[in-house]
From Swiss-Prot:
PANTHER family, per the entry: IODOTHYRONINE DEIODINASE, THYROXINE 5-DEIODINASE
Name recorded for this polypeptide: Thyroxine 5-deiodinase
Pfam families (UniProt xref): T4_deiodinase (PF00837)
Gene that this polypeptide is encoded by: DIO3
Keywords: Cell membrane, Endosome, Membrane, Oxidoreductase, Selenocysteine, Signal-anchor, Thyroid hormones biosynthesis, Transmembrane, Transmembrane helix
Protein species of origin: Homo sapiens
């Protein structure tokens, strides 16, 4: 009898040790996963840091007005003269990509601007979207009713879907909205367009610029984002508009901060524009749409 009791005791101790090892193993795996993520983020920061320093140095130089005027003036002179386009009434149409203007009273190298630049470069580095790859089906929100949807819900069959990311406080985005609207009017028969309102580029409580056409603080809630999007919607009629989530899921997936253009077709990214402000070029989108239109209608048989 004593021997049996002893054997039971030993078995009980073994079961207890196995039960204790379960939580310990789970904790160890969790710790290892967090360590790997930390190492990956550290490595990415080391890769991004030289690029960030270069941008910061450029912003510091541009705070000297003589350098700013010379640099911006040289960029304007280096750009080819756009072809003059006339509307139906014979009036000259503004260019697709008007030059970026920075007022003399705006400081470019500040703590707020450096935070915004770092945020944008980090989103671009970690984005899931790449030209030729699958389009992330990230979550978006309808302005009316806050109903949750996804970006690919707006894709219809084989029709291209143009994504235009931006906000009201981004001067290049707003300055080129009229050019974007002309493309919507011209190609909406064969192409779908979607504006995704993201976090403010130059909020009144962040990186402030007097060149921004609106004074809007950072969004603290979806209600704030809806209010800002309503302002944009008044100037962009006829085009579907949705909101990015407060977790900025779409902006993160597409690396869209400050602004960006994409074209999706059959779940694949066919065109990926550069990151704004410099890479945001409506003229590039126009070129892509013109080529698509030629291929689409050129393949159709002609009536004799």
């Amino acid at each position: 009898m004593p021997r049996q009791a002893t054997s039971r005791l030993v078995v009980g101790e073994g079961e207890g040790s196995q039960g204790a090892s379960g939580p310990a193993a789970t904790m160890l795996r969790s710790l290892l996963l967090h360590s790997l993520r930390l190492c990956a983020q550290t490595a990415s920061c080391l890769v991004l840091f030289p690029r960030f320093l270069g941008t910061a140095f450029m912003l510091w130089l541009l705070d000297f007005l003589c350098i700013r005027k010379h640099f911006l003036g040289r960029r304007r002179r280096g750009q080819p003269e756009p072809e003059v386009e006339l509307n139906s009434e014979g009036e000259e149409v503004p260019p697709d990509d008007p030059p970026i203007c920075v007022s003399d009273d705006n400081r470019l190298c500040t703590l707020a601007s450096l935070k915004a630049v770092w945020h944008g470069q980090k989103l671009d580095f970690f984005k899931q979207a790449h030209e030729g790859g699958p389009a992330p089906n990230s979550e978006v929100v309808l302005p009316d009713g806050f109903q949750s949807q996804h970006i690919l819900d707006y894709a219809q069959g084989n029709r291209p879907l143009v994504l235009n990311f931006g906000s009201c406080t981004u001067p290049p985005f707003m300055a080129r909205m009229s050019a974007f609207q002309r493309l919507v009017t011209k190609y909406q028969r064969d192409v779908d367009f979607l504006i995704i309102y993201i976090e403010e580029a130059h909020p009144s409580d962040g990186w402030v610029t007097t060149d921004s056409p609106y004074i809007i603080p950072q969004h603290r809630s979806l209600e704030d984002r809806v209010s800002a999007a309503r302002v944009l919607q008044q100037g962009a009629p006829g085009c579907a508009l949705v909101l990015d989530t407060m977790a900025n899921s779409s902006s993160s997936a597409y690396g869209a901060y400050f602004e960006r253009l994409y074209v999706i077709q059959s779940g694949t990214i066919m065109y990926q524009g550069g990151r704004g402000p410099d890479g945001y070029q409506v003229s590039e989108l126009r070129t892509w749409l013109e080529r698509y239109d030629e291929q689409l209608h050129g393949a159709r048989p002609r009536r004799v």
